[in-house]
Amino acid sequence: MDMSVIMRYGDDKAEELCLEVEDYWARVDESDGFDVEGIQAPPGGTPLIHYDCHLPNSRHPDPVLVKLYASAGLHRYNMLEGTNFKLVDVMKFNKLMMHLSPFYITLLAQDPVSRSQQTFQVQVDEHCLSTMDLTVLIARPKAVSTNESVLAPQSFSVEESPEWPSDFNDGKRFYRVKESELRNNDWISLYLQLVLVSHDRMRISDSDLSKLKIVEAVIETKDDMLPPNERLLNAKTAIVYITFKGFTKCRIGDEHTERKTIVRRIFDEDTGHLSIKGELIGEYKLGGDFDPGCYFNSPAILEARRICQGLPPQPF
């Protein structure tokens, strides 16, 4: 409860407001945080802000990152279910008005073979600002319930990334992904895009991501595997070493400069949660260009503040 609200309404009202906040989150929890439209948030709390991506002239924070988070959820679902659903559209999402927030995303996906479409719900939690460090807690068709608790504390985390190996010659430890396999395993490209956009969510656009080219991708697991070891492509716990070029939003070098990133993924068999952590190797954090004044005074953020405060929207 916000202390300014207690000061405004007095101690007599504080207990009542606390009960209203508890009731609000109980109602939010009924849909696991995905369907909060029409749930009135009491003053003094930190409610989920709802964004309808289908509204005319819809503005919302981090549109590129939200789409990547939606794809990360589908990646987790496909990995576990042996499917190949692709993102068609982000329909809506909810998040907190905080630097780091869980994202509750409702999306439309399509099976590229049958062409059938299905609505999914995805929850992605962020753990670090300006670095790719996330956990996919929920990834399911909309009609399926997983009994997750909204905003429950999560203890599962990914270990620190390893050093870049001196070579990848150990065939029992490493697997070099073939170019044809890159096309059929677009999650590798997804990981690369997530690393870059997580570092600089304000500047990188879909157009920037379309120019990226993976020069080499190598996969490693902790278990030695006799070559040929294509099975590493489907390992639930793995380290991915990616060399790429085509990145134009950089201070050092240009789009022809080859760069490196390491991504570690760990799947928790007990909870079903997928955690992914990645970083650029030998480069500054792109978040150094993060301008809080620009970000928190952007039209999308100002609109979110008005929603949070219960004020009517105003034209920009």
Curated annotation (Swiss-Prot):
Q: Which Pfam families match?
A: protein_MS5
Instruction: Quote the PANTHER family the UniProt record gives.
Output: CYSTATIN/MONELLIN SUPERFAMILY PROTEIN, MALECTIN-LIKE DOMAIN-CONTAINING PROTEIN
UniProt lists the family membership as follows: Belongs to the UPF0725 (EMB2204) family.
Protein name per its UniProtKB record: UPF0725 protein At1g02770
Organism of origin: Arabidopsis thaliana
